[in-house]
């Protein structure tokens, strides 16, 4: 006899008492119509045995506390083991302060010092400088209403728009903008680890991650971060129900969310910028205050990673990147004090080892 919860026994590193309950609920009771009543007890004993012989029982940690900067001096709000699944509950980038369309961002004394609250940080046991923190995005669930704003100073059309707040209803996976409905595609705007130097506010990106605003950092993606301090200090927030590349006016559909991730480590692997892995591509995320410098940062890192994986020299790798790799803009809402962020993507090469790992 088979029951739906079996995959949780086979694949999980650990089980909780809730998994046992779920598995028992999954049993097709019609299978017992012509069997001895002791079958039920047998199933329960089997589940108990499986749990007992798994690793130490852990219940998913739920992280709610947040900070406004990435800092090696931040006190961890939780500690996690590699392989553990964590849940982060996040505010929107305005700390949920824009309650109605009558509330304008210009009335908040808004600045990047108090923008983009990131839930965490979480100390990852065993993470040391020189390692890579691997974050698998398992799920991103958003609230039923989000916010778009213009502030009169940000983006290429700031002088062709007025300051405005627009509330966007989310219903059954669709956003409603003035009666135009389109599917949401939730993504995480701010995610990263602590830098080993000066603090970086959550609204800024850097080689630690931060406000990368990549619409590819969503459910199903795997993101790799350099570890520069003990414990890595992972934090995340600034979820968008949907956002276009470049985030033209400075916001996507900003929205509170619940994120589930799995964390793991790669020991002693050089990584200089965060990398996103999708089903078929690798993307280096890099930034600078102008396009040329951001492109150079991303190009150098992607070239290095491809060379390590293939054994090609610099020139062959440069040529290959020119014909098979694409530059895409994460955020470019200039003029804006936030640096330009881009991603440089290349297809996975089944003939060679992965770029990371």
List the model feature ranges, each with a label.
Residues 93-103, 140-150, 231-241, 330-332:
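Short, Lys/Arg- and Gly-enriched loop/turn segments at beta-strand edges
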Residues 139-219, 224:
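Intrinsically disordered, low-complexity linker/loop segments enriched in Gly/Pro
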Residues 9, 25, 45-47, 51:
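Cysteine-centered motifs
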């Amino acid at each position: 006899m088979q029951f739906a919860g079996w995959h949780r026994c086979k694949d999980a590193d650990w089980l909780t008492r809730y998994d046992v309950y779920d598995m028992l609920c999954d049993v097709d009771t019609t299978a017992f119509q012509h069997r001895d009543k002791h079958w039920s007890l047998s199933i329960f004993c089997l589940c108990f045995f499986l749990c007992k012989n798994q690793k130490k029982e852990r219940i998913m940690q739920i992280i709610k506390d947040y900070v406004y900067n990435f800092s090696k001096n931040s006190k961890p709000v939780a500690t996690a083991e590699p392989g553990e699944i964590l849940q982060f509950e996040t505010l929107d980038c305005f700390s949920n302060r824009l309650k109605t369309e009558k509330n304008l961002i210009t009335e908040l004394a808004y600045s990047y010092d108090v923008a983009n609250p990131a839930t965490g940080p979480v100390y990852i046991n065993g993470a040391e400088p020189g390692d890579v923190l691997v974050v698998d995005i398992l799920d991103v669930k958003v609230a039923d209403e989000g916010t778009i704003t213009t502030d009169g100073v940000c983006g290429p059309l700031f002088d062709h728009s007025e300051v405005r707040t627009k509330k966007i209803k989310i219903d059954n996976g669709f956003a409603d903008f003035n009666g135009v409905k389109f599917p949401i595609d939730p993504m995480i705007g701010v995610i990263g680890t602590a830098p080993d130097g000066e603090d970086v506010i959550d609204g800024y990106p850097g080689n630690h991650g931060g406000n990368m605003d990549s619409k590819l950092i969503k459910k199903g993606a795997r993101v790799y971060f350099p570890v520069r301090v003990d414990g890595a200090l992972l934090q995340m927030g600034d979820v968008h129900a949907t956002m276009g590349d470049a985030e033209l006016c400075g916001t996507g559909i900003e929205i509170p969310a619940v994120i589930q991730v799995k964390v793991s480590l790669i020991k002693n692997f050089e990584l200089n910028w965060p990398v996103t892995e999708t089903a078929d591509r690798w993307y280096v995320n890099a930034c600078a205050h102008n396009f040329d410098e951001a492109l150079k940062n991303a190009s150098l890192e992607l070239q290095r990673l491809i060379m390590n994986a293939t054994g090609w020299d610099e020139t062959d790798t440069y040529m290959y990147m020119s014909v098979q790799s694409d530059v895409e803009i994460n955020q470019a809402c200039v003029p804006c004090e936030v640096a330009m962020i881009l991603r440089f993507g290349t297809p996975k090469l089944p003939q060679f080892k992965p770029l990371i790992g």
